[in-house]
């Protein structure tokens, strides 16, 4: 059975369309369907010197992979013509429309997964649309109360307790309820999506030296340690809280299936240093599979043909792999 994978290229003025067009030059063992504007893709392909044949997507037809140099397309119109590297808030709604369609078509079973290209949160908000990120948007669209953002590269998976919030708000956001929900989703999806029977998860402390017995902060003593005890008593295998400045060593990571970091810039700098351009963003807890790139829109590289396809390619391959495993287990 050929699986259908939805792809949203992201911000039209950035490198997302470039990367998708490059990757469409090869064959895939799934039907890749771009949810995007045809004219925008054709103009970008011409600018890059790439040949592309766009095939109108018919969800009622049998799913077949596109030949190299071709791409199935679900049309969504941009509001205004796209200028390379120049943000235009008039096209903010276009970006959200591509995400909404991807979400709806994954929810109704048309697609087996969605792969998202990089978006520019600022320009979407400038258009008057509240948007904090893909993870939160897909959770809202699918009526999912709690989701977890996890990035993965070779030998390292990092999930986050908090995501796109100011650093000043992190401490108050780390509650027993939040920790239980995030750790439970992470543990469950490592078992069901990645086939890890009993995941071993390393948990970062919030404060320097994991609080150093309360001398550098009490969040570990008051919240994190008691919550980990509750979860471990339920059968999970959570180790911590551990000092984040020493946790990310091979001698610890080689024995772990994932790291649970308290906030965005605690866990992700290490992962991106280890595998930037070769890592993938995976949203856990959603009723459908969603993967994404590990980088931004790179407006300065749009249309130049020099942007690295590594992370986008990995995101597509990971989505196909997870979708195949899900199909086999159903």
From Swiss-Prot:
Q: Which GO terms describe its cellular component?
A: cytoplasm
Annotated keywords = Cobalt, Cytoplasm, Magnesium, Metal-binding, NAD, NADP, Oxidoreductase, Pyridoxine biosynthesis, Zinc
Q: How is the cofactor bound?
A: Binds 1 divalent metal cation per subunit. Can use ions such as Zn(2+), Mg(2+) or Co(2+).
Question: Which reaction is the catalytic activity of this chain?
Answer: 4-(phosphooxy)-L-threonine + NAD(+) = 3-amino-2-oxopropyl phosphate + CO2 + NADH
Database matches in SUPFAM superfamilies:
Isocitrate/Isopropylmalate dehydrogenase-like
> What positions belong to coiled-coil segments?
none
EC annotation from Swiss-Prot or TrEMBL: 1.1.1.262
Q: Where does substrate bind?
A: 134-135, 272, 281, 290
Q: What class of enzyme is it?
A: oxidoreductase
Which compartment or compartments is the protein found in? Cytoplasm
Chief location category: cytoplasm
Q: State where a divalent metal cation binds.
A: 164, 209, 264
Pfam families per UniProt: PdxA (PF04166)
Cofactor(s) in the UniProt record: Zn(2+); Mg(2+); Co(2+)
Q: In which pathway does it act?
A: Cofactor biosynthesis; pyridoxine 5'-phosphate biosynthesis; pyridoxine 5'-phosphate from D-erythrose 4-phosphate: step 4/5
Per the record, the domain of life is Bacteria
Q: What does the record list as GO biological process?
A: pyridoxal phosphate biosynthetic process; pyridoxine biosynthetic process
Q: Can you tell me which family this protein belongs to?
A: Belongs to the PdxA family.
Another remark in the UniProt entry says: The active site is located at the dimer interface.
PANTHER family annotated for this entry?
4-HYDROXYTHREONINE-4-PHOSPHATE DEHYDROGENASE
Its assembly, as annotated, is: Homodimer.
The role this protein plays is: Catalyzes the NAD(P)-dependent oxidation of 4-(phosphooxy)-L-threonine (HTP) into 2-amino-3-oxo-4-(phosphooxy)butyric acid which spontaneously decarboxylates to form 3-amino-2-oxopropyl phosphate (AHAP).
Q: What is this protein called?
A: 4-hydroxythreonine-4-phosphate dehydrogenase
- Organism, by scientific name, is Pseudoalteromonas translucida (strain TAC 125)
Please spell out the taxonomic lineage of the organism that makes this protein.
Bacteria, Pseudomonadati, Pseudomonadota, Gammaproteobacteria, Alteromonadales
């Amino acid at each position: 059975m050929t699986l259908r994978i939805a792809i949203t290229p992201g911000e039209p003025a950035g490198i997302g369309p470039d990367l998708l067009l490059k990757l469409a030059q090869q064959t895939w063992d799934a039907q890749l369907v771009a949810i995007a504007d045809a004219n925008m893709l054709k103009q970008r392909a011409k600018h890059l010197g790439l040949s592309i044949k766009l095939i109108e997507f018919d969800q009622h037809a049998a799913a077949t992979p596109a030949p190299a140099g071709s791409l199935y397309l679900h049309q969504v119109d941009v509001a205004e013509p796209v200028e390379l590297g120049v943000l235009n808030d008039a096209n903010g709604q276009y970006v959200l429309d591509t995400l909404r369609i991807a979400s709806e078509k994954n929810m109704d079973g048309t697609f087996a997964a969605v792969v998202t290209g990089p978006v520019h949160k600022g320009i979407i908000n400038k258009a008057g649309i509240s948007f904090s990120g893909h993870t939160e948007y897909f959770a809202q669209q699918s009526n999912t109360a709690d989701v977890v953002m996890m990035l993965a590269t070779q030998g390292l998976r990092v999930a986050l307790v908090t995501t796109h919030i100011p650093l000043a708000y992190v401490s108050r956001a780390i509650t027993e309820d939040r920790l239980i929900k995030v750790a439970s989703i992470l543990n469950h999806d490592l078992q069901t999506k990645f086939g890890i029977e009993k995941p071993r998860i390393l948990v970062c402390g919030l404060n320097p030296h994991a609080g150093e017995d309360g001398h550098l902060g009490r969040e570990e003593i008051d919240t994190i340690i008691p919550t980990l005890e509750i979860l471990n008593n339920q059968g999970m295998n959570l180790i911590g809280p551990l000092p984040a400045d020493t946790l990310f060593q091979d001698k610890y990571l080689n024995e772990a299936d994932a790291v649970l970091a308290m906030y965005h810039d605690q866990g992700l700098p290490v992962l991106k240093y280890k595998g930037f351009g070769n890592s993938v963003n995976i949203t856990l807890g959603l009723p459908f599979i969603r993967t994404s790139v590990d980088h931004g829109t790179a407006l300065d590289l749009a249309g130049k043909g020099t942007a690295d396809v590594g992370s986008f390619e990995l995101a597509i391959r990971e989505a196909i792999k997870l979708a195949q495993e899900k199909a086999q287990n159903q």
